[in-house]
């Protein structure tokens, strides 16, 4: 079979959620972020597994994701929408019983004109300048909004993966300034914020990348393995080049394995001539450019070339691969393409 295999350990995702739940203050509810189709790993399977583990609050990016997730989860858990109540979202929010995180006075007006008794939350901007009401806007609508009984007031940290960054303390102070004294549950932290300590936990945490084995949660169990089949092995002599642009040249006689995956499968070209693949725990350098459907790998040092080499495995997680590609683990995970044969272990189907 020429199709690469992406193996996903749902039990590891559940174990990572439990670990982050334990890391949160014991009085804190621990939600789960499953946007972007569960970081590319199937939001329905991930969410059902986490619901069985105890998660009751789920977060998605847009209402359309929430509709799909509701079909997978059923009526029980809450599904919160980070983008809030956008124009055209009313039917989806009502039909799938979604909870929009209101980001502006405009969204607040839209929500209460269309769905005056429907649950909602509030998102505040405490310094990231991305989503949420800024302080002046919040001051103008806070009395009305709080009087309608929001389910949650939240913000998001810009630099939580850098524990010593001054922005963390500044955003924490601003969140306190904007919300101290309210009786509504509050949430500031995703994975990185959980690891910053109890001062950042408030009433609910929202782990995302840590569930899927990514930094900054260094204790995470590995979740994915990507095994790519070897199509062909050829001998090369010193001075011969490999791949488009002749960007890799053999320094000595050796062997090149051609593997069946490429940038059409989400393996970004920036990892060309930089990334490693693995035969067990033996590293094999990517030789030449990533092409649409193929990789070429230097296997000169292997006594025997296996039927497949691993790009993601215990020896190389998403963050190590991301470092080679000059990106972040989030991009590696969410780019994994549809051509892979996906095998799920554990969890809930």
UniProtKB/Swiss-Prot annotation:
Cofactor dependence: pyridoxal 5'-phosphate
One Pfam family it belongs to: Ala_racemase_C
Pathway(s) it belongs to: Amino-acid biosynthesis; D-alanine biosynthesis; D-alanine from L-alanine: step 1/1
Protein keywords: Isomerase, Pyridoxal phosphate
N6-(pyridoxal phosphate)lysine, modified sites: 35
InterPro entries, sorted: Ala_racemase, Ala_racemase/Decarboxylase_C, Ala_racemase_C, Ala_racemase_N, Ala_racemase_pyridoxalP-BS, PLP-binding_barrel
Cellular component terms per the entry's GO annotation: cytosol
PROSITE patterns referenced in this protein's UniProt entry, alphabetically: ALANINE_RACEMASE (PS00395)
Transmembrane segments: none
Binding site residues for substrate: 130, 292
Catalysed transformations (reactions): L-alanine = D-alanine
Gene3D superfamilies xref list: Alanine racemase, Lyase, Ornithine Decarboxylase, Chain A, domain 1
Keyword Isomerase set for record: yes
EC number: 5.1.1.1
GO molecular function: alanine racemase activity; pyridoxal phosphate binding
Active site: 35 (proton acceptor), 244 (proton acceptor)
Annotated signal peptide: none
Keyword Isomerase set for record: yes
Protein role: Catalyzes the interconversion of L-alanine and D-alanine. May also act on other amino acids.
Similarity annotation: Belongs to the alanine racemase family.
The protein's name in its UniProt record: Alanine racemase
Source organism of the structure: Dinoroseobacter shibae (strain DSM 16493 / NCIMB 14021 / DFL 12)
């Amino acid at each position: 079979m020429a199709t690469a295999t992406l193996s996903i350990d749902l039990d590891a995702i559940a174990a990572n959620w439990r670990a982050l739940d334990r890391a949160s203050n014991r009085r804190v509810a621990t939600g789960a972020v499953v946007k972007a189709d569960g970081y590319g790993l199937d939001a329905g399977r991930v969410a059902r597994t986490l619901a069985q583990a105890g998660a009751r609050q789920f977060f998605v990016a847009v209402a359309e994701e929430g509709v799909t997730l509701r079909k997978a989860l059923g009526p029980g858990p809450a599904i919160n929408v980070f983008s809030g109540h956008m124009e055209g979202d009313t039917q989806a929010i009502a039909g799938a019983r979604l909870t929009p995180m209101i980001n502006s006075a405009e969204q607040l007006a839209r929500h209460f004109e269309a769905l005056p008794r429907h649950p909602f939350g509030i998102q505040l901007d405490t310094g990231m300048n991305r989503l949420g009401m800024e302080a002046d806007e919040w001051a103008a609508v806070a009395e009305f909004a709080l009087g309608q009984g929001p389910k949650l007031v939240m913000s998001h940290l810009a630099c939580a993966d850098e524990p010593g960054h001054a922005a963390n303390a500044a955003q924490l102070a601003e969140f306190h300034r904007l919300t101290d004294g309210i009786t509504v549950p509050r949430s500031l932290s995703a994975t990185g914020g959980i690891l910053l300590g109890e001062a950042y936990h408030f009433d609910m945490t929202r782990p995302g990348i840590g569930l899927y084995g990514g930094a900054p949660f260094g204790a995470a169990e590995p979740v994915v393995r990507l095994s790519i089949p070897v199509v062909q092995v050829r001998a090369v002599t010193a001075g011969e080049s490999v791949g488009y642009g002749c960007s890799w040249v053999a320094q000595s006689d050796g062997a090149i394995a051609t593997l069946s995956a490429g940038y059409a499968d989400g393996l970004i070209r920036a990892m060309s001539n930089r990334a490693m693949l693995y035969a067990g725990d033996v590293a094999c350098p990517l030789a030449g450019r990533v092409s649409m459907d193929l990789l070429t790998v230097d296997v000169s040092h292997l006594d025997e070339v296996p039927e497949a080499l691993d790009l993601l495995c215990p020896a190389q997680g998403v963050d190590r691969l991301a470092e080679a590609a000059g990106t972040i683990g989030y991009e590696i995970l969410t780019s994994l393409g549809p051509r892979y044969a996906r095998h799920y272990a554990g969890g809930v189907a």
